[in-house]
Amino acid sequence: DKNLSKKAIKYGYNDTMKAFNKLEGNRYTFKKGQIEKNNNMYQQTYEHIMSKVLRFKNATKDFYKQLKITSDIPTKLEDKLLLRVMELVAKDFNLDDTKIYTYRSFNRAIRKELKKRIKELDTTETRKTKKTEVELYLEMEKGNYKDLRTLGLLNPIELLKAVYLYTICED
């Protein structure tokens, strides 16, 4: 298949450039320095929102225990965690993983897809426990932090993704 071949060539190019430190990212590919720029732009807001949602020391400890990491994580690990969250959101939103992104083009694509998914969301079917990052994002917009805390402990990865969505949509 012609499209499959094109995709394979793009993957090969991206991976080679990553190996030579010309591009960065794991599953998704970013121009050099873009992940750091994204972190500089959003890390503080991201952490602020996380602390607002978790609010209590025990909730924070329980949350990070769910993720199997300590709450006093060093910056390098935090950077990797934020990249992991970004890429999980992108995967859920079916972003093109052959494209080379800047942090702006990446976040723009995510915001565009988020708007589409909010429109598609069937509000009559509200689940009590397993909520998607889009549903958690909407709860965050309403300021339902108590519910978010509970749901976040049940689905820590979904909460991290929702906080990322909220962070990039607030600027």
For each feature predicted by the language model, list its residue ranges:
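Patatin-like phospholipase
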Residues: 1-171
